[in-house]
Amino acid sequence: MSSQPLTLQAMMAAILNFWSEQGCIIHQGYDLEVGAGTFNPATFLQSLGPEPFRTAYIEPSRRPQDGRYGQHPNRLQKYHQLQVILKPVPENFLSLYLESLKVIGLNLVDHDIRFVHDDWENPTIGAWGLGWEVWLNGMEITQLTYFQAVGSKPLDAISGEITYGVERIAMYLQKKNSVYDVMWNGSLTYGDITQYAEQAWSQYNFETANTTMWLKHFDDFSAEALATLDQGLPLPAYDFVIKASHAFNMLDSRGVISVTERTRYIAKIRQLARAAADKYVAWRESLGFPLLKTPPSTPTVTPKKIPTICQPEDFLLEIGSEELPATFVPTGIQQLESLAKKLLADHGIAYKHLEVLGTPRRLALCIEGLSHVTIRPESEKKGPPLSLLFMTDGSVSPQGEQFFPSHGLSISHRSALDQPSAICRVRSINGTDYLFLVIPEERKETAAILVNELPQLIRSIRFPQKMTWDNGGVEYARPIRWLVALYGDQILPISLGFVSSGNTSWGHRQLDNRQLTIPSSNMYVDTLRSACVIVSQKERRAIIKQGLQNLTGDQIVAIAPEHLVDETVFLTEHPFVISAQFDPAFCSLPKELLIAEMIQHQRYFPTQNMQGEITNRFLIVCDNSPTDSIVEGNEKALAPRLTDGNFLFKQDLLTPLSSFVEKLKSVTYFESLGSLADKTSRLKLHLEEAYALLPLCAKEDIDTAIHYCKADLVSSVVNEFPELQGIMGRYYLQNASLSRAAALAIGEHLQHITLGSNISTTGALLSILDRIDNLLSCFILGLLPTSSHDPYALRRQSLEILTLLYTTQSSVDIEDLFARLIRHFPSSIPNTVWSPEEVLSKLNTFVWGRLRTILSSLGFDKEIIATVLTDNCPKNPLTIIQSAQSIQELKNTQILKTIAATHNRLKKILASLSFSVTEQMFSLQSAEDLLFKQALDRFVEETTALPISSKDYLHLLKELAQSTELFLDSVRVASDDESTRNQRIALLIAAQKCFGFYAWDVL
């Protein structure tokens, strides 16, 4: 970076001049309020159709909701985007962008520049694309996008969009902590020119804007857009689309648009934008697309000779691309490995070892000892019996006349088969002669197979999203820029779109950005290492883990969730771990908020002391050699994030909780079931019904917890960090000096619950009721999970309900609980036909399936689980789990063996008898009958107050089993006397019921 940083206007002029030299038209910002440079017709309209176009311009952008009254260091309601559109996008798109940074004084070697996954979308105008946020030492400075659709229309030619955040770049260049301190020119700051306007417009946007007027504006502008389109004027019509969009943004900032209404407004603007796009393309086509001077090129492939490989060799396929999203690389690794193994297996190609390596810029298939040929030995295929192919006189039968030509055989008589043949032969099986076709040995060169199959293999790699970047007909996660295909030291000629394979790869984009010649496939890893690329993801992970450990110690530990470690592994090709600091004053913010800001927004590793308190040190995984500029830049990048978090948190603390609760009325839970306020009211009814069954905590605490449990959903912090819902509610209740137990419960009720979770009793009850309401809601609305899709996490929530009932030792009939709580839902729901009986039947079946999972996770084997989970078992999860525990402890003892044997004997005897006993009318005559009846009565009396899950119950059941065996050994059940026979059958039926809670026959 130069010693004298550029002023804001000099910097913008330098970038515009750079792009002017690249053939761009230098437009001015549009003369309407737009939310982003994409709205400018030079982008929105010019991206449509096949006509090439290059432009650059500075767009003043209005986002009313982003206003911070001129107090935030870089959050503004009006800011500037320097927009570049390159259509069609050139192959050196990223290189051109990096060159443009040099003209403003950035020495790329000194900085950590990242291309971070960003799938951009503007649903308001039906535009989306794939690309990146560009980070300069942790600060997002640019957005790069390959447009895929605009105006809800797939594009004829792909445009590359570059959106510079000029204020942020200027802050970095001038080393300013606030945008308002940036020098606009040599004498005036950004604040001198804009800060008062930011204050005034924030007040207007949030407090005083006339919503009635803006609502009317939206309707008027929408109507005028349609009317103008009807007149065949797409350019004026699109202006009114822009105006309608700004009216919507104003209404949104005033908070007068509910979630449901917001969706409707966006859909309306998107429809208008689509109509304008259609009219525009039709208009340009009617003019003959005047800017289209030459037709687009198509790929041409010149066949190249496939090399001859004479022995097994190592093989390398490297797919070199622009930076893949970090979460896509593991997917690509897995896909490439499975596809390659299948390809080799399908063709019978032998190899020693196969591995796939991956970095942001490459996926590499490395195969050790790949056989140079695949040989399929001669084989035979059984055909029809000769009796079907020939007549008795040896002539060919009608069936034979069809069979022989269809298999390329010229046979006119049975005698032709008497001569030795290389194509067919006769074999006798069990006295019947059959014709066997001979499939000759087949030898194929592996190189030829790979040349033919690898292009399709690459196309078959499935990513969460794919894109196109030219008219080469290839889709991939990001543009493919090179291919390496080496079999030993020989190049396999592979073509994919406009890209052909070779033996040249590329080094690290910043540390050693040069083209590399790979001498042979077995030198791939070392050659890449020489250019500062650590291609092995395992090695990069080890470096990061060790770096995190080295920079902490006995008193401080890194907060390093595995998903963040994974992401940093695949954000880097040569990782370095460095330490930085932020202002200790921010440590007073909620720990979870600080962690979210650092991990989610910045991919930093926070640290905490041994007491679990957050510290002001954080760790950075960068992809360039550490410098003071990188450390300082990341510290400056985090400061605004923490400032914004502090601003949002303080704003929430100043808002009464009652105001949050009131706002829940305008937040939709499920459209057919009303708002979150309606859900909260339903939870209160659930509590009144369930508290007697689940008296886990003080009533006043759970009352408070339910009243406020959803309040933080409308808070500023949770709007920015949805994953902090519940957690922030705890802080807001504490700030309001409400019940500590209620505050803790709210903080706990959305956390994932496992058998090892530590949760308060109030939190447990709130969690149970909230999850039951979610289950009932989804089952009533028919939103059931499928085998592969569970968008509302109903499986997890049902597991958590059962886990909480077990860990709190809550004994309750869960089917009865569901039946009680379902009464709190309206019997008539819009667009939904439902019956409580049908819903409860499906829900009960679903939940019992999850109880089986709980039992398995507790270590019970399949036989125990099948024994306790029966149609006759109690509908009490705790009882069932305790029963499994008791049976597990007594497994393999004589007690259970006796019970099981007697149960099975009873079952077999009763199944063998024909009877119709409807009442137990006992007038017992024999001593054996009377003695057995006394044993049955004694068992019922002694177990009346005894849980069936207890071992004492099982001991008593064993005693009954012994009495039953004695009875069966002493009498003839099928007595000739009908009365005696019926009485004894009735006794056995009564005994069987005593055994009937469990499926003893599976033990």
From Swiss-Prot:
Please, which domain of life does this record's source organism belong to? Bacteria
Determine if ATP-binding is one of this entry's keywords: yes
Pfam annotation, one family: tRNA-synt_2e
The record's listing under NCBIfam families reads: glyQ, glyS, PRK09348.1, PRK14908.1
GO CC annotation: cytosol
Which SUPFAM superfamilies does the record match to this protein?
Class II aaRS and biotin synthetases (SSF55681)
MF terms in GO: arginine-tRNA ligase activity; ATP binding; glycine-tRNA ligase activity
List, alphabetically, the HAMAP family matched. Gly_tRNA_synth_alpha (MF_00254), Gly_tRNA_synth_beta (MF_00255)
What class does this enzyme belong to in the EC scheme? Answer: ligase
Glycine--tRNA ligase beta subunit, as annotated region = 311-1003
Q: Where is this region: Glycine--tRNA ligase alpha subunit?
A: 1-310
Tell me the protein's name.
Answer: Glycine--tRNA ligase
Print the keywords alphabetically. Answer: Aminoacyl-tRNA synthetase, ATP-binding, Cytoplasm, Ligase, Nucleotide-binding, Protein biosynthesis
Q: Which GO terms describe its biological process?
A: arginyl-tRNA aminoacylation; glycyl-tRNA aminoacylation
- Spell out the reaction equation it catalyses: tRNA(Gly) + glycine + ATP = glycyl-tRNA(Gly) + AMP + diphosphate
* E.C. no: 6.1.1.14
The Swiss-Prot or TrEMBL record describes its family as follows: Belongs to the class-II aminoacyl-tRNA synthetase family.
Q: List the InterPro entries.
A: aa-tRNA-synth_II/BPL/LPL, DALR_anticod-bd, Gly-tRNA-synth_bsu, Gly-tRNA-synth_heterodimer, Gly-tRNA_ligase_asu
Query: Where is it located?
Result: Cytoplasm
